[in-house]
């Protein structure tokens, strides 16, 4: 069973359907006790950083999410679910993130020929932290975002993407995996990535 966090700002049904297509059941919840008891956890997200982290805190979900990550059980963040893991985001002001990873989230500042938001299919380049993800450099995933993460520790960068310059497309640290792109919208390669998450061994800390 995979648990998907509901804080009213994620494309929950499409994530749930993608999980179920990998042959694993998925539940959607905003209940802290269910999050704490989860076997595997997905934090999705679509929208603005400040609104999202505000909803997480308003619903008292910050501690159970951080405790889950610390437990060593498999965790997947998607889009805003990646960005909120960092210390600060600057979308519509300065907002404190979950602080699970050091670094911040900043806006694209690109030449006029590059449209923002970065929307559509783009290729990724695999780094050392992503070597065991079963992804090859040049694989395309679907992106929709105007901000990107800047990890303080470069060793957590699993995948990068080039859009007017290189940016972090995914991070990996132990049981934690998070992507800027949407695997649930990325057809076969995205579904394979989700299946890999759904079947990853659980190593509880």
Curated annotation (Swiss-Prot):
GO terms for biological process: L-histidine biosynthetic process. Residues 1-205 form the Glutamine amidotransferase type-1 domain. The keyword Hydrolase applies. It is found in: Cytoplasm. The active site is at residues 79, 182, 184. One of its GO terms (cellular component) is cytoplasm. Its EC number is 4.3.2.10, 3.5.1.2. Keywords: Amino-acid biosynthesis, Cytoplasm, Glutamine amidotransferase, Histidine biosynthesis, Hydrolase, Lyase. It catalyses: 5-[(5-phospho-1-deoxy-D-ribulos-1-ylimino)methylamino]-1-(5-phospho-beta-D-ribosyl)imidazole-4-carboxamide + L-glutamine = D-erythro-1-(imidazol-4-yl)glycerol 3-phosphate + 5-amino-1-(5-phospho-beta-D-ribosyl)imidazole-4-carboxamide + L-glutamate + H(+); L-glutamine + H2O = L-glutamate + NH4(+). The keyword Hydrolase applies. Pathway: Amino-acid biosynthesis; L-histidine biosynthesis; L-histidine from 5-phospho-alpha-D-ribose 1-diphosphate: step 5/9. GO terms for molecular function: glutaminase activity; imidazoleglycerol-phosphate synthase activity; lyase activity. InterPro entries: Class_I_gatase-like, GATASE, Imidazole-glycPsynth_HisH. NCBIfam families: IMP_synth_hisH. IGPS catalyzes the conversion of PRFAR and glutamine to IGP, AICAR and glutamate. The HisH subunit catalyzes the hydrolysis of glutamine to glutamate and ammonia as part of the synthesis of IGP and AICAR. The resulting ammonia molecule is channeled to the active site of HisF. Heterodimer of HisH and HisF. HAMAP family: HisH (MF_00278). PANTHER family: IMIDAZOLE GLYCEROL PHOSPHATE SYNTHASE SUBUNIT HISH. This is Imidazole glycerol phosphate synthase subunit HisH. The gene is hisH.
């Amino acid at each position: 069973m995979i648990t998907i966090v509901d804080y009213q700002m994620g494309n929950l049904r499409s994530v749930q359907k993608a999980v179920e297509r990998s042959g694993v059941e998925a539940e959607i919840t905003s209940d802290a006790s269910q999050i704490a008891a989860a076997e595997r956890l997905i934090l999705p997200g679509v929208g603005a950083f400040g609104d999202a982290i505000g909803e997480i805190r308003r619903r008292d979900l910050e501690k159970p999410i951080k405790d889950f990550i610390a437990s060593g059980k498999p965790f997947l963040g998607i889009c805003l679910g990646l960005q909120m893991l960092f210390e600060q985001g600057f979308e519509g002001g300065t907002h404190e993130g979950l602080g699970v990873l050091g670094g911040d989230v900043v806006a694209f500042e690109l030449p006029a020929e590059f449209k923002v938001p970065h929307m559509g299919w783009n290729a990724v380049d695999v780094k050392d932290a992503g070597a065991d993800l079963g992804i090859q450099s040049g694989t395309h995933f679907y992106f929709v975002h105007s901000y990107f993460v800047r990890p303080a520790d470069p060793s957590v960068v699993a995948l990068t993407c080039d859009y007017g310059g290189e940016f972090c497309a995914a991070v990996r640290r132990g049981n934690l995996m998070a992507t800027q792109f949407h695997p649930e919208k990325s057809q076969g390669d995205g579904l394979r990535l989700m299946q890999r998450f759904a079947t990853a061994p659980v190593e509880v800390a």
